[in-house]
């Protein structure tokens, strides 16, 4: 693996542009607050935009740090057991009565359809 640091000019330019843009918007909101039509909402935004600029630099710094030394994968420790009684029991299927005439008739109908389908599939063109 290479020991040289990777520089990404496009990413650095993006961080600089985003930071400058956030600081410019903060300055704009500050001047709006100081004007005669300024409100406390403008003051809130004037204080928020520098935080957004700081976050752009912080996120880039963490990105570079994680890229240089990625976090260690978790070690293959023992799998955790689920305590008994934590999960609900699976429902049991309802038992059908063995002598259900409707079910018997339906199954016979399905068997007849399967035979007809098999006959149609086995036809040869001669």
Curated annotation (Swiss-Prot):
Keyword Ligase: no
Subcellular location field: Cell membrane
Residues that span the membrane, as ranges: 40-60
Keyword Cell inner membrane among UniProt keywords: no
Keyword vocabulary terms for this entry: Cell membrane, Lipoprotein, Membrane, Palmitate, Signal, Transmembrane, Transmembrane helix
Lipidation (S-diacylglycerol cysteine): 22
Lipid attachment, kind N-palmitoyl cysteine: 22
Chief place where the protein resides: membrane
Name of the featured protein: Putative lipoprotein LprD
Lineage, opening ranks: Bacteria, Bacillati, Actinomycetota, Actinomycetes, Mycobacteriales
Gene (name only): lprD
